[in-house]
Amino acid sequence: VNGSGLDIIARIETPFAEKFGVPRQSGIADSPGRIVFEKPFRDVDAVRGLEGFSHIWLIWQFDRALRQGWSPTVRPPRLGGNERVGVFATRSPFRPNGLGLSAVELERVALDEPEGPVLYVRGADMVSGTPIVDIKPYLAYADSYPDAAGGFTGGDAGAVLTVDFPPELLAQFDSGQRHGLLRALAADPRPRYQDDPDRVYGMAYAGKNVRFTVQDGTVRVVGVE
């Protein structure tokens, strides 16, 4: 049980070791993820029937952003970090209860792994090690509203950049990691207020540091360490 009084039922393993580079929403980049249950919840009966669903909801904790107290307004990145709006009109991690909600693709349910049942997913917007407090099936007939208004976000995922990733550098990642990495870079991982074409950024992904610049709508990868 954590400080919020909720049981941590599992933790997710993702290619993202730090917050920089994590997609701003789930589904933007289809990076692989692996959900491992905590010991009290490693029961195959708890996931019986889950294999019939293509997507699931993850309810999780912003464990790297927990703080005492809260502010009724925040500065969302979509508005450049300058304009304040109500915290409940955003998906900011700085919330009264510090909980996140993500819909991810469920690739498979593995029942024969040493850690008990393991869920293999794609599209999570979470740092590796993030605690999960609940899992529920995604139901398209109840959970999808294609015509929903998007408020100040405009209802879209934002600009998509062109990615120039030299093949010899991309080859350092396995085939299951490459597409998610390209999508994460195309979504522009930089803070919205940073637009220095000469700056070299570093993004931790799958145990490597991807170094890149951004200029004229193109991400150019200059090194992988």
Residue positions per predicted region:
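Active-site-adjacent substructure of cysteine-protease-like catalytic cores
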Residues: 48-100, 193-197
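Basic/aromatic recognition patch in beta-strand/loop cores that engages polyanionic ligands
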Residues: 196-216
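Arg/Lys-rich, positively charged N-terminal/basic patches that mediate binding to nucleic acids
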Residues: 3-44, 50-52, 140-184, 199
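Enriched for short, Lys/Arg-rich terminal
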Residues: 215-225
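Short coil-to-beta-strand transition motifs
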Residues: 2-8, 94-104, 206
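Short, conserved beta-turn/loop elements at beta-strand boundaries and strand-helix junctions
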Residues: 17, 108-119, 217
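Flexible glycine-rich active-site/ligand-binding loops centered on an Asp-His dyad
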Residues: 119-153
